[in-house]
Curated annotation (Swiss-Prot):
Organism: Mycobacteroides abscessus (strain ATCC 19977 / DSM 44196 / CCUG 20993 / CIP 104536 / JCM 13569 / NCTC 13031 / TMC 1543 / L948)
Protein name according to UniProt: Small ribosomal subunit protein uS7
Subunit structure: Part of the 30S ribosomal subunit. Contacts proteins S9 and S11.
Signal peptide, first to last residue: none
Domain of life of the source: Bacteria
Similarity-based family: Belongs to the universal ribosomal protein uS7 family.
Function: One of the primary rRNA binding proteins, it binds directly to 16S rRNA where it nucleates assembly of the head domain of the 30S subunit. Is located at the subunit interface close to the decoding center, probably blocks exit of the E-site tRNA.
Molecular function in Gene Ontology: rRNA binding; structural constituent of ribosome; tRNA binding
UniProt keywords, alphabetically: Ribonucleoprotein, Ribosomal protein, RNA-binding, rRNA-binding, tRNA-binding
Length: 156
């Protein structure tokens, strides 16, 4: 266990193209093997495709998708006596953003379109319309929290 405490969080720079921290976070989530230029190409291409298909600002579309994917509740394991309970807890805003971005990228990679640009663009568009696997993941998370509501008094 480190004695210094948690590492301080560094400030995120705004994205050079769209001027948005959210786009910077998305680029960092798409990033594989340190190849940032490729990650930027994928994200910018996906946002351009989203602009072409909707005719609106892609950052607004991305924010709408994020609002539809961000979880409000999740379950965490808590051991009480000999039993492990799934205790529903509220999700902190920074964690909900991180989870939403992670789910968007993960389910984009699992899609069947030909290129990652198309996959990410279509997942963002689906999520902004309340469809897609990432929105389903959020609903499943909320259902799980609702089903385990009886254990909410074990919150810490």
């Amino acid at each position: 266990m480190p004695r210094k405490g948690p590492a301080p969080s560094r400030p995120l720079v705004n994205d050079p193209v769209y001027g948005s921290q959210l786009v910077t976070q998305l680029v960092n989530k798409v990033l594989l093997d340190g190849k940032k230029s490729i990650a930027e190409r994928i994200v910018y291409g996906a946002l351009e495709q989203a602009r072409d298909k909707t005719g609106t600002d892609p950052v607004v579309t991305l924010k709408r998708a994020m609002d539809n994917v961000k979880p409000a509740l999740e379950v965490r394991s808590r051991r009480v006596g000999g039993a492990t309970y799934q205790v529903p807890v509220e999700v902190r805003p920074d964690r909900s953003t991180t989870l939403a971005l992670r789910w968007l990228v993960t389910f984009s990679r699992a899609r069947r379109e030909k290129t990652m640009v198309e996959r990410l663009a279509n997942e963002i568009l689906d999520a902004s319309n309340g469809l897609g696997a990432s929105v389903k993941r959020r609903e499943d998370t909320h259902k799980m929290a609702e089903a385990n509501r009886a254990f909410a008094h074990y919150r810490w």
